[in-house]
Amino acid sequence: MTIIPAIDIIEGNCVRLEQGDYKKITVYDKNPLDVARQFEDAGLKRLHLVDLDGAKAGAVKNWKVLETIAGKTNLFIDFGGGIKTEKDVQIVFDSGAALTTIGSIATENENEFRSWIQKFGAAKFFLGADVKNEKIAIHGWQKITDIDMYDFIKKYLDKKVTQIFCTDVNKDGKLQGPSLDLYKNILERFPDLYFVASGGISSLKDLEELKNIGCSASIVGKAIYENKISLKKLELFNSTN
């Protein structure tokens, strides 16, 4: 199972929000490049980079942070937050992202997202299925829809989008453990999915459990910044899995 460390960006700073609440912000580092280099030095290969300013504004804002990290590391980066137009997708790829992370647009403007799939290819997108009580959440979790998450996942699997990450809004930023039952249900329904767990991870035990139920990868954020899981331990886990 691949470990994907997360960097969330507000005003160029490395931050974390609790449950997507912009009022519950913690600034961890003012230099995201330094953080990314620490991940790379620990042998991690991927990076989940989130533009929280963009997510709130509905347009890409922190593309220069992406450009800097992509230009000065060899990390395989997925980047998302506020991507609403084809121009934004192009900016993300031009700035060095390997994958564009898609969330709200796949729910609110399916035709637009379908056109991006046709232009760039389904393999270039990392689809976020953020959920609360098995319903899709959008706009940085500020809005809970009536869309069933299983229907949502199936729709885009049928369109050949195979990399999907799922964040349980009830768990994120709380370090209370991942939603194992939820993820098991998803993996049982969609065994061919490259499924990435996200939210609530607080220990190596959590990562072992996610690996054991069949997750392809796990996004780890707050647990790193709060020193619940050291980079040394992540490096060891990564090298033996």
Could you say what each language-model-derived stretch is?
Residues 14-60:
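N-terminal beta-alpha supersecondary unit
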Residues 28-40, 84-90, 144-155, 207:
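Short, acidic/polar
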Residues 1-3, 43-46, 73-77, 97-98, ...:
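Short, well-ordered coil/turn segments that N-cap beta-strands
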Residues 3, 54-70, 84-90, 104-126, ...:
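Active-site-adjacent beta->alpha loops and helix N-cap segments on the catalytic face
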Residues 48-51, 78, 101-102, 126, ...:
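Conserved beta-strand positions in the central sheet of alpha/beta enzyme cores
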Residues 73, 77-99, 181-217:
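Catalytic cores of alpha/beta
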Residues 12, 17-23, 98-172:
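Conserved anion-binding
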